[in-house]
Amino acid sequence: NGELDAMVFAACYVCGELLIQRMDGIRDGYKETFPEFSDDLVFRFENSGGEGQIVNTKKIVTDFVTGHPNMNRIVVGTNNDEGGLGALSAIEGMGMKENFFIVSHGGDTPFQEKIHAGKGDVWIGSVAYMPERYGEFMIPWLLDILNGKDVPREMSPEHFILTTDNINQYYPKK
């Protein structure tokens, strides 16, 4: 029904404003459909520790559930797919798949492998950056610069959400 008890974000907040905006985009997207969702239910955890994203995120999610036993409908947002792996490991280890959704950033191999393995019921999406396609938009932009044309100061490919519905279009199962 779309109702949440909490959003738990595990990210490298010390990495800067752009990353903070990416994480807040998860919240903002949800609030487009459910505008009454309180920002007080968004819990942000720094995830730049030395143990790595997978281990850190697993601990963050496990500790959050332990400390908030009455929160049963939770979205975990991570700034990369390694964090998504940690969240999935925690959720599966606690036997709470029906209580969680994971949204990550990257659309990289860890996400692709888990979706192809049928884990899309929990890990529902990852923002795809597709760095392997950067040349498709960078080369024309660079040629315009070399030819003296006015170009935007910054360029970025369009990002989108990879899900079980579209993953084979971009990354077919091997």
Q: What is the predicted function of each stretch?
A:
Residues 26, 41-114:
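Hydrophobic alpha-helical
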Residues 1-5, 21-22, 54-58, 84, ...:
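Hydrophobic alpha-helical segments within soluble ligand-binding/sensing domains
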Residues 1-37:
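Extracytoplasmic substrate-binding proteins
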Residues 6-9, 31-54, 158:
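Short beta-strand elements in bilobed, periplasmic/extracellular small-molecule ligand-binding domains
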Residues 11-12, 118-132:
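Short beta-strand elements at the ligand-binding edges of bilobed clamshell
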Residues 1, 29-36, 60-67, 90-94, ...:
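Structured segments of extracytoplasmic/periplasmic soluble domains
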Residues 10, 18, 129-174:
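Hinge/cleft segment of the Venus flytrap/periplasmic-binding protein
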Residues 5, 72-75, 124-125:
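Conserved acidic residues
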